[in-house]
Amino acid sequence: MKFGGYFTKSVDDLKIDEELSKLIPENTMSDKIKNEIQKYGFLYPVIIDQNGFVIDGYTRVRIAKELGIKEVPVIVYIFDSPEERMRSAIQLNVIRRHLTHEQIEQLYQKYLSTGLSPKEAVKKLDKELKQENIRIKNLEPKMRAVEILQSEAPELFELLAKYQLDPQLLLQFYLSIKEFYDYFKQLPEEKKLEILRSERLLLQVEAEPALLKQFAEAEKFASSVTSVPTTEQEDNGDLESFYRGVDGNEEELIRSKEELNEALEQMGLGTEEEEAENQDEQLFSEFIEELKSGSVTAVPKSIEVYKKENGRLIKIEGEIYLKRKS
């Protein structure tokens, strides 16, 4: 199980796995939960898997729909197998609801549907729940950090969901600037991000579905652009001239350090290769956001293009990328 990020998501996009939901006893505190949501808002994020299926929060999702709530906070977890996903769902609900022994026994009985004998099911599930409990406890500080940010610093909570920041690090940042928070929250988003970047908080992004989706969209955009300027080197270009020419040669965006070094060697770039080896591997997420936003003012200050027979080496504000002919 791997942490995948915090987001806000449309209630209508949340999926229910009917088979998995059968393993979870009905919540007998629906009315109390509904009253709390009406009074305090949707404080506890729904936990979903990488495919958008609810792992924990069935009752809250149903209540949100009843109350006409359009979007709710979610935590994404990436599971390696259906078995891990099922164990986590059961354990999360055991912890959250403080189930009675009778309810836990019902879970054991439902686990028999996997084909194990009653004795084997009880023994196996009990062992796995104990192991899972250790991992689930690591989630509690993150959830607490999310709750504090959501109630005390909604402006930071918005950035948390939007940029998939580490909630515990962001909470530490909030506590350190709490005295000046009224000033901070009035700053434009660009200035807030500049401050977070200087504190290295924006570097805490973990791999998660939304980020992968961004890169898939960006790669699709990049592959639709089939050429760059034909000069051997073009300094301080702009976005329009960068994508000006069309020669019909489809190109593949190269992201991995290994692929980059191999292609540089094939292209015989010499000093550029040495420089590239010293560059940290970058995902250029900000550049992607600029492309997706369509902002004509968000043009990189410096674009250098080195055209070679097998492709083009591109330096955007000092960071090196490569587009190679397929």
UniProtKB/Swiss-Prot annotation:
Q: Which InterPro entries match?
A: ParB/Sulfiredoxin_dom, ParB/Sulfiredoxin_sf
CDD domains, per database record = pNOB8_ParB_N_like (cd16404)
Organism annotation? Acidianus two-tailed virus
Report the Pfam families cross-referenced here: ParBc
SMART domains referenced in this protein's UniProt entry, alphabetically: ParB
| Taxonomy of the source species | Viruses, Viruses incertae sedis, Bicaudaviridae, Bicaudavirus
| Protein name per the record | Uncharacterized protein ORF326b
Q: In which domain of life is the source organism classified? A: Viruses
Concerning its family, UniProt says: Belongs to the ParB family.
